[in-house]
Amino acid sequence: MTLQALETIRSCDLIVLPAVSKEECYAYRIVEQVCPEIADMPLLCMPFPMIKDAQKLELAHKRIYDAMEDYLRQGLRVGMLTIGDPGIYSTYMYMHRCAADAGWEARIVSGVPSFCAVAARLGISLGEKDEEIHIIPAAYDVRESLGFHGTRIYMKSGKKLEELLWVLRESMQDKESRVHQDIYGISNCGMENEQVYCGLDELEQAKGYLTTVIVKEHVVQ
């Protein structure tokens, strides 16, 4: 996490956690390592539903925001934790838009995207020269991404990892012999239960919602 994020957390009167409890909140566990005083700060645990029904999702977001706004009306500085960067597939942006639309001052504090942390942990580059970089939410249909060249990053692939690996295996059979793919994966990057995988066979053992898969495609000369 960044120094700005750390200073912002310390300046808040209340911290919102997008989870049932602090023990189940990945973001809280990360922050606690560098900001132990968060254990003594007031917390509001508000789990976000992992659903795709737009109407139900909107109602859930409104309920969560209404709970947060009660504290804003009391004059408190409210912060919300999220893993990675708030601008990349983050639950925070729903609350940010609600607060801004209601006239509150809302600030986005940038963070370290999970796939950048994963690449650093693996010691690899995501893109060089004219290589393309594609970021794909793995919870949705990933088949269209198979035609993308360069580096493909599949985020939060845990729940659909089995399907993703099957699709990748099928695509490797269809690729030209001159096209080579390096496949990596990390579950829970930076945490005490971090696991690193190289190749599809090792990825078969991967578990956890926070699994990032990186596929680097290049042509063998």
Residue ranges with predicted function:
Residues 3-104, 203, 210-212, 216-221:
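Class I S-adenosyl-L-methionine
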Residues 147-221:
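A contiguous loop/helix-start segment that scaffolds small-molecule binding in enzyme catalytic cores
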Residues 56-65, 121-124, 147-151, 196-203:
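Short, surface-exposed amphipathic charged segments that create phosphate/polyanion-binding patches used
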Residues 43-45, 106, 135, 183-185:
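Conserved beta-strand scaffold positions in the cores of enzyme catalytic domains, especially
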Residues 87-148, 204, 218:
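Class I SAM-dependent methyltransferase SAM-binding "motif I" and its flanking Rossmann-like core
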Residues 48-54, 141-143, 191-193:
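A short acidic, often aromatic-flanked loop/helix-cap motif at beta-alpha or helix-coil junctions
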